[in-house]
Amino acid sequence: MAKIQFIQGVDEEAIPDVKLSRSQDGANGIAKFYFDKPTVFDVYQGEITGLYLIDEEGELSTRTVYAKFINGKPQSIEASYIMNNREEWERFIRFMERYAKQNDLSFTKAKN
């Protein structure tokens, strides 16, 4: 089961918008996640410590996570996951394929 967490042990229910970019040689890439009104803001079981992508292969994580506030209230979370080589890229894609299938999501290639 593929899941996303901001607080370890607390699954995020909001489905993110994910944008991927990759270097021309495929050696590295970045995934940017945007969560509008994530459910983690409704949970008071600790602080957000990172973005954790968890599946049967293990865990991918990043500490590059930012919350956006409007009028003093949390509204969204943005996170970036950097992939430094082809193996990390392929591992991330496997996670996203599982997460997408589980949540009935699709992948759309950007138009040039």
From Swiss-Prot:
It is a peripheral membrane protein. Disulfide bonds: none annotated. One of its GO terms (biological process) is photosynthesis. GO terms for cellular component: cyanelle thylakoid membrane; photosystem II. Its main location: plastid. The keyword Thylakoid applies. Keywords: Cyanelle, Membrane, Photosynthesis, Photosystem II, Plastid, Thylakoid. It is found in: Plastid, Cyanelle thylakoid membrane. Part of the photosystem II complex. This is Photosystem II reaction center Psb28 protein. It comes from Cyanophora paradoxa. The gene is psb28.
